[in-house]
Amino acid sequence: MKIWTSEHVFDHPWETVTTAAMQKYPNPMNPSVVGVDVLDRHIDPSGKLHSHRLLSTEWGLPSIVKSLIGAARTKTYVQEHSVVDPVEKTMELKSTNISFTNMVSVDERLIYKPHPQDPEKTVLTQEAIITVKGVSLSSYLEGLMASTISSNASKGREAMEWVIHKLNAEIEELTASARGTIRTPMAAAAFAEK
């Protein structure tokens, strides 16, 4: 078993970061995620948003793994459960693979919280537990997978910034459009008075 952990601070408020986290896929930074399906989404009586999603991924595999499973590329599926608590301002996301579970398990946990000293920033704490089963090189493979997870986490943070930039651009566009819509009737009314 290999445990990988990371902490990152986003220079954006919690509301922005959690909105982006829910819209992270697809993105150009991590094209291995080829599909996201929402299986269930509901708000519980306390106001927490619960989501259960299925992520479809396609990976190019290292040669040692190819020889073990007999494939060069493989589609895998990951189940993801998240809980967003708008009162406590926390988002906890847990994911686990549901493909190849007889060979490997990857359990990941992400927690987004406002930065304790700066509410305009958000802290992401990330942990992955990797277990390769039934292979004599399991420790080596777990290390290799931890390295891949670390690289993908970096891509994931880039993707979050990309989504946040995209969301901000959409907000600016909608704001500009709304201003134009408001001005047009006002200009017409002013013209009609003349």
Swiss-Prot record:
PROSITE patterns reported for this sequence: PRELI_MSF1
Cellular component GO terms, alphabetical: mitochondrial intermembrane space; mitochondrion
Source organism superkingdom: Eukaryota
Chain positions with Phosphoserine modification: S46, S51
GO BP term, example: phospholipid transport
Keywords: Phosphoprotein
Database matches in PANTHER family: MSF1/PX19 RELATED (PTHR11158)
A Pfam family this chain is assigned to: PRELI
Xref: InterPro entries: PRELI/MSF1_dom, Slowmo/Ups
An example Gene Ontology molecular-function term: phosphatidic acid transfer activity
Ranges for domain PRELI/MSF1: 1-172
Organism of derivation: Homo sapiens
Protein name in UniProt: PRELI domain containing protein 3B
Keyword Transit peptide carried by entry: no
Signal peptide (UniProt feature, chain positions): none
